[in-house]
Amino acid sequence: MFKIASSPHSHSGKLTARIMLWVILAMLPAIFAQLYYFGFGVLFQITIAVVFALCLEFLVTILRKKPKLFYISDFSVTLTALILAVAIPPYAPYWIILIGIFCAVILGKHVYGGLGQNPFNPAMVGYVVLLVSFPMQMTTWLAPVQLLHEPPTFIDAYHLIFSGGTTDGFSLHQLTASIDGMSSATPLDAVKTGLKANRGLAEINRSPLFTQSSLAGLGWFQVNLAFLLGGLFLVWKRIIHWQIPTALLITVCLFSLCSWLFSDNMPSPLWQLFSGATMFCAFFIATDPVTASITPKGKLVFGVLVGLLLCLIRFYGGYPDGAAFAILLANICVPLIDQYTRPRVTGYDLRGKN
């Protein structure tokens, strides 16, 4: 069972709704960056996710005979929907986000009793279910609109998501057919696939996805930078603690530094920090106050564990990015981490004797 630290206790004065709103506000720069580089599909995914999540939350509270307004007005389900919506490919079919939200809200949250009682991050539960069940849809990304000869319009985005093709009859794959095939993959996927095909890193970096950006791939670097700025804002506002993102990013940096120094075909540590979901994971997912460690030392251990698992899966696993799996695996370890990192009670030594 989870344990509560010994008194005295202090109240932070921060309401759940206020915390959630600050986090949503901090995500806006990254959402705008994603919208600029990856098109209008982002808006559709967010709208579908938030509306369906609120409706599902309303229905579940009725079935569980819980206060409906109380659960919806804390914005927790809105944040869950927002996190999942920006994590999936912007032009994924509409039913992908519907299934993901259902799994996040039901399997990731209410099965365990609701907010505050779930051991796993709900958004990552939904994401992993989607990634394992629908790998093709979850790994097909449209190239940044700056690389496309005819970027999808708002109407095209609607038709791509709801019918699988634009008004002119082009599918998602056909939109990137005139560009190097690497451009339809994420930078992490492009590098991993290229290395498996015995292509050198220098050759991979000549792809249009990399030539128009100095670091980590066009669009992806900018989105990660926006998440970093939003995360630093949350640390400054004391909405999240500094230990988890700091420990996570240092671990990723050190792990990638060792790989980079001993191999010419490994991207630099800076590349690893600003690619994939690294910054998103460090500041907005791993810092979930419900599913992360609650002790000061435990937060450091938790951050290191997430960073280590992320790198192991990213470098040696079958998936290009291991953020979601790293979070869920680390969530399993939280009770054990908290058990062995509890602060010493005032007036007692480490053995528990006064």
Swiss-Prot record:
EC number per UniProt: 7.-.-.-
Membrane protein topology class: Multi-pass membrane protein
Cofactor: FMN
GO cellular component, one term: plasma membrane
Single Gene Ontology BP annotation: transmembrane transport
Annotated InterPro entries: NqrB/RnfD, RnfD_bac
Location(s), subcellular: Cell inner membrane
Residues annotated as transmembrane: 19-39, 40-60, 70-89, 94-116, 123-143, 215-235, 242-262, 266-286, 300-320, 321-341
Positions of post-translational FMN phosphoryl threonine modification: T186
Top-level class of the enzyme under EC nomenclature: translocase
Entry function: Part of a membrane-bound complex that couples electron transfer with translocation of ions across the membrane.
HAMAP family found in the cross-reference section: RsxD_RnfD (MF_00462)
Name under which the protein is recorded: Ion-translocating oxidoreductase complex subunit D
